[in-house]
Amino acid sequence: MDSHYGDIEGKDRAEEGLARQSLEIKVSSEPLTPANPVEQEPEPKPEPEPTQGREPESETQPVSDSSKAKDSEGIDYAHVEVPESPGAAETAGEAVSREPESLPQTQPKTKPESKEPEDKDEDEDEDEDEDEDEDEDEDEDEDEGEERDRPEKPKGKGKREKRKESRFRPSLPLTTIVEEGAAPGPQAAKEKARESLKKRDSEEIEGTDRERHKSTEEQLHPGEAKEEEKQKGASTEEFEWTADMQKLQEQQLRGELVEQYHSLLVERNRYQRYNMYLQQKIHETLRKKGLEAAAEPGDKSAEPESPEKEQAYLRYLAMLEELKKQEADDLEWYRQEVRELKQQCQEKQTRVEKEWRRFQALKKQVVMQVMGSCRTRGGRQAALREVEQLQALEDKKEKEMSAVRLENVQLKQSLVHFETRMKAQEDLAEGLLLIDFEQLKIENQTFNEKVEERNEELLKLRTKVTSNVQIITHVKEKLSFIDTENSCKKAQLSEVDAQVALGRDLLTKTKQARDSLRIDNVKLSQKCGLLGKESLLRDLEEKVEKTEMLNRRLESLKRHHAGLALSCKGVKQKIREAKTFLPS
């Protein structure tokens, strides 16, 4: 009966978790388009989603903030739809900028340390962060059914909640925020938180009464303590199952969040590059307008627009700085929340392990007492070994059961997710299913025609392939024949090369003999003179005859000249003598 009760209780807890996740899926499954505005969200989210609150701000965040973003791996990035264009980014920003208003909707709870005097605003913010962390931790404890000791409720709960709402409320007019749709969200969340707190108070009171009743019954009826211990063992077994399941769920969720974190980092870098590109375009346009204004001083139409544009630019810069500050505050708050949740999870795990060890020790003690009373064969050592084997087998079966239950819960969650998506698609496509069916039939016919055409083309290609295969085989045969012929030609070429080499050697030797004979011929021709040269000899004879004739003529001319010279001298003598006889 106890195990059956534990199974029913585990199923109820799984259904509560699935219902909570269905709310998140229902909100995130709606497309962020102008056709589906933000007012259509049916219910506010009970849990904060940090990514939706700061997705638009990450577009203008500098690159140096990436080191800060890496520290927040545990932040829930689920159900974030990144817009593909700047227009889609604006619409997504309109839808997402409303999410931080629903963050402080849960009822805060303070720790005993928060009773110290708050002197600074920073201390107050830290206390508020701790209150929010404890509140979310209490929601998880309600699902597990654990009983805890809680401090008293703080008196300034509403005041801190208002501060948290004012800190997360986007007060900047960057995007159009629909406040009418988000107005009833905090009230419903507050009512839900109050109901959960009342339920926890009643459970704690029942737990304390149950413990007192058990203590009194143990004092009055010590024999019934063993049965109660067995029931307690079954409940701790169920508690161990829920803790293992929660641990596996947290590990799986952490892996998914890390993957989403890396994908969002890539998107953030892309938007940063796009932001730099837009800033460069703005700079170029402003510079061009400045050059045009300097080139055309007479045109004063652009002068009244420049102050307005400067004011708008400064206003947007101030908005950007405020958004960055708000993002830094939100990031610090989420980091603090993650640290607190990790610490609480570690405490839960240690407490669960401690209780499980104590429960195993108690079972071991009870079994040893029972087996000792039965006086089993082998004595105490054999009984101890048998008990250890049974406990090891029990641990193995518990692990297998927890894994199977976790898989069952995951399948149920995926089923709910798909059902919500199908319902959303049916709501969107209501009234258009018949038209879609007709269009699909037409498309199916066109696709069938295309398939037939493709089949015909495939047959043609197959015939071409067969013909090409035959051609390739023929070419291969011809290639092999040409290879053999080429090898024969290469052998012949090698023989011809050898003959050419021998001929070259003979040619060099004959050239050397020719050169030597030519030199000898030149020497002999120099020695023999005009021997064997008839033309030269004839010419020489003619020249000799001409020289002899010219020499004879020269001798005759010399004699004639000498006779003329003697006659001239005689004439001159006669003239001189005649002059002497002439009278002066």
From Swiss-Prot:
UniProt region (Disordered), positions on chain: 1-243
GO cellular component terms listed in the entry, alphabetical order: centrosome; cilium; cytoplasm
Top-level taxonomic group: Eukaryota
Cystine pairs: none
Coiled coil found in the keyword field: yes
Physiological role: In complex with CFAP263, acts as a regulator of ciliary beating that connects radial spoke 3 (RS3) to the inner dynein arm (IDA) and the nexin-dynein regulatory complex (N-DRC). The complex is positioned parallel to N-DRC and forms a connection between the arch at the base of RS3, the IDA tail and N-DRC.
Subunit structure: Forms a complex with CFAP263; the interaction is required for functional activity in cilia.
This protein's name: Cilia- and flagella-associated protein 184
Organism: Mus musculus (Mouse)
